[in-house]
Curated annotation (Swiss-Prot):
Reactions listed under catalytic activity: [pyruvate, water dikinase] + ADP = [pyruvate, water dikinase]-phosphate + AMP + H(+); [pyruvate, water dikinase]-phosphate + phosphate + H(+) = [pyruvate, water dikinase] + diphosphate
Species: Pseudomonas putida (strain GB-1)
Presence of keyword Nucleotide-binding: yes
Enzyme class: transferase
Alphabetical list of Pfam families matching this protein: Kinase-PPPase (PF03618)
Keywords (A to Z) from UniProt: Kinase, Nucleotide-binding, Serine/threonine-protein kinase, Transferase
Protein name: Putative phosphoenolpyruvate synthase regulatory protein
NCBIfam families (alphabetical): PRK05339.1
GO MF, one annotated term: ATP binding
Function: Bifunctional serine/threonine kinase and phosphorylase involved in the regulation of the phosphoenolpyruvate synthase (PEPS) by catalyzing its phosphorylation/dephosphorylation.
InterPro entries in the record: Kinase-pyrophosphorylase, PSRP
Family: Belongs to the pyruvate, phosphate/water dikinase regulatory protein family. PSRP subfamily.
């Protein structure tokens, strides 16, 4: 049975959505319709939200799951009249923390993601800009400033992994696509050799790579299984020859791939 889940906040909704998504991911056998509702910061908006929740409950025949980070108690009380199963993320975690730390929390809206109060904001933006500027081997003369350089065949997940590490941890990650020319030379391109200590390889199952490439260039040599199998085989051989640590991205989320890379390379997150 498909369930409905709402991520509701009187701020950006980032915290409610991130934690809610992580919790729901533990129930792989249950499909969810997920809706994020940020800036529910007035009684009128809260009452409209109640109508949406109740409509979902009537449609599904079971109450929706509600993850919220609402600070205003009046708004919370309005939401509590809905036919939803409420999970107040802040109070669930902050109350025991307050007891352990013997201190009261500030419990402010969007605190961890605010620009003015977040010293990591500019670091995050700079890391994202670095990932975009150094995507897909477009530029290589800034590799000395990179924390990591991801290498692998085209469309194996390098770009989303670089952007995720930039957004979440402030990591400056570049990526370089290995081509047939690189494979035929049986060695790393010169620009990568001098940064060998920063390299991490991504590989992927050939059938998955074929499916991804087919969406971009259907019925082409680029997306054929034979070509994908050849490239993956040659790149994995190159990784072994050059002693480049690597991971198969096929069955992992970008979050898992990023965490494994940072642990294996020993790269410290600029912020957590």
């Amino acid at each position: 049975m498909k369930r409905t889940a709402f991520f509701i906040s009187d701020g950006t909704g980032i915290t409610a959505e991130t934690l809610g998504q992580s919790l729901l991911a533990q129930f792989e056998s249950i499909p969810f319709n997920k809706f994020t509702r940020p800036y529910i910061d007035s009684p009128d908006k809260a009452r409209t939200m109640v109508q949406q929740i109740n409509a979902a409950a009537e449609r599904d025949g079971v109450r929706p799951i509600i993850f919220d980070t609402i600070v205003n108690q009046d708004i919370r009380e309005i939401l509590a009249t809905s036919n939803g199963f409420m999970i107040d993320i802040f109070s669930s975690f902050l109350s025991p923390l307050e007891q352990e730390l013997t201190a009261h929390s500030s419990y402010s809206v969007g605190k961890s993601h605010s620009i003015g109060g977040n010293s990591n904001y500019m670091e995050r933006i700079e890391a994202v800009n670095f990932a975009l500027d150094n995507d897909d081997g477009a530029r290589t003369h800034y590799y000395d400033k990179a924390d990591l350089i991801l290498v692998g065949v085209s469309r194996c997940g390098k770009t989303p992994t670089c952007l995720y590490m930039a957004m979440q941890f402030g990591i400056r990650a570049a990526n370089y696509p290995l081509t047939e020319d690189d494979m035929e030379r049986l060695q790393l391109p010169a620009v990568l050799k001098k940064h060998h200590n920063k390299l991490f390889g991504l590989t992927i199952d050939p059938d998955r790579l074929t499916a991804i490439r087919h969406e971009r260039k259907p019925n082409s040599r680029y997306s054929s299984f034979a070509q994908c199998e050849f490239e993956v085989r040659e790149v994995e051989s190159l990784f072994r020859r050059e002693n480049i640590p690597n991971i198969n991205s096929t069955h992992f989320s970008v979050e898992e791939i990023s965490a494994k890379i940072l642990v294996e390379k020993g790269v410290e997150r600029r912020f957590k």
